[in-house]
A protein has these predicted regions:
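Mid-to-C-terminal alpha-helical segments outside catalytic/metal-binding sites
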Residues: 1-11, 17-52, 217-224, 235-275
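A general structural detector for well-ordered alpha-helical segments in enzyme core domains, enriched
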Residues: 40-44, 68-75, 96-100, 123-127, ...
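A cross-domain feature marking catalytic cores of carbohydrate-active enzymes
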Residues: 10, 57, 84-88, 110-112, ...
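Conserved, mostly hydrophobic/aromatic
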Residues: 9, 45, 72, 100, ...
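Catalytic pocket-lining loop regions of alpha/beta-barrel enzymes
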Residues: 106-107, 120-224, 272-274
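N-terminal small/glycine-rich loop or linker at the start of catalytic domains
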Residues: 12-22, 68, 74-78
Length: 275
């Protein structure tokens, strides 16, 4: 099947930081063509037939807020748009949210383990209310890849966040943690329609049967294709969906249509991609 493809989950860095970004996550590689920089993402997109990628910057330290988002803004192209990074403990977080709105960022990315925050903590309720007011879609790293970490977030935490931000699209990365190490106390049941999951790393970590079972239970209308470039492979993640037993219409929902609907609500869907 041939259709549009939107990759909701990619990461690119300045050249000076790209190698370090790979080392920190245990993906050290000396091949320049495999570094997470814009030129390499564009090349992988062309190879995989991806029409649009969303860059997800991570602000690991509050003092890096401005620098990280300036780079994210500067690196955007017609086929690469960017969410803004936000550290919940940055000074004047409400003001920083207004800045991200002024910068016309497409949404907000959080990574609790890297940022060392419990996003569901009541002290962040004001931040979540402001995000809800501004209408930002949010994409959050979920679960853990290798070992359990103190700040890992699971669906139970999302349920708490929804009390302060009930209206915005919330995208739970890594299939809501279920393509990572399993937490037997967690599930994806009874989450509202504005909560989505992406497929980042699922092609690499999930068996095909389990991958499809999770999606069928959650609903193809709430699943977004994501590769987690450079840590995941765009071609493999796309093939996992295309080779599945879902209908062509359901595959299109996951590969681009669901993401397009979210991006359209914030005016970030390119004109060449029509719903």
């Amino acid at each position: 099947m041939n259709c549009r493809i939107i990759d909701i989950h990619t990461h690119i860095y300045p050249v000076a930081l790209a190698r370090r970004a790979m080392e920190v996550t245990g993906h050290e590689n000396d091949d320049f063509k495999k570094l997470p920089i814009r030129e390499n993402l564009l090349a992988r997109m062309q190879e995989a037939g991806v029409d649009l990628s969303v860059n997800l910057p991570v602000v690991s330290k509050p003092q890096n807020q401005g620098e990280v988002n300036r780079f994210a803004k500067e690196t955007a192209r017609k086929n690469i748009i960017s969410f803004g990074g936000l550290h919940p403990d940055c000074e004047n977080v409400i003001e920083e949210l207004e800045k991200l709105k002024d910068m016309e960022m497409a949404g907000i990315k959080f990574h609790p383990p890297f940022q060392k925050v419990h996003l569901e903590d009541p002290k962040y309720e004001e931040m979540w209310r402001k995000i809800n007011e501004l209408g930002f879609p949010v994409l959050i790293h979920m679960g853990t890849a290798r070992i359990v970490r103190p700040y890992d977030l699971y669906p139970s935490g999302i349920r708490k966040i929804l009390k302060s931000a009930p209206d915005i699209p919330i995208i739970m990365a890594h299939m809501g943690s279920f393509c990572m190490m399993k937490n037997p106390n967690e599930n994806l049941e009874n989450l509202p329609e504005n909560v989505f999951i992406d497929t980042a790393m699922s092609a690499e970590l999930e068996e095909a049967g389990e991958f499809e079972e999770i999606i069928r239970r959650f609903g193809t209308n709430r699943v977004l294709y994501g590769s987690d470039f450079p840590y995941g492979t765009q071609k493999a993640a796309i093939a996992r969906i295309k080779d599945s037993s879902f209908t062509d219409s359901e595959k299109e929902d996951m590969l681009w249509r669901n993401a397009a609907k979210i991006l359209k609500t914030v005016g970030k869907l390119p004109e060449n991609i029509e719903l």
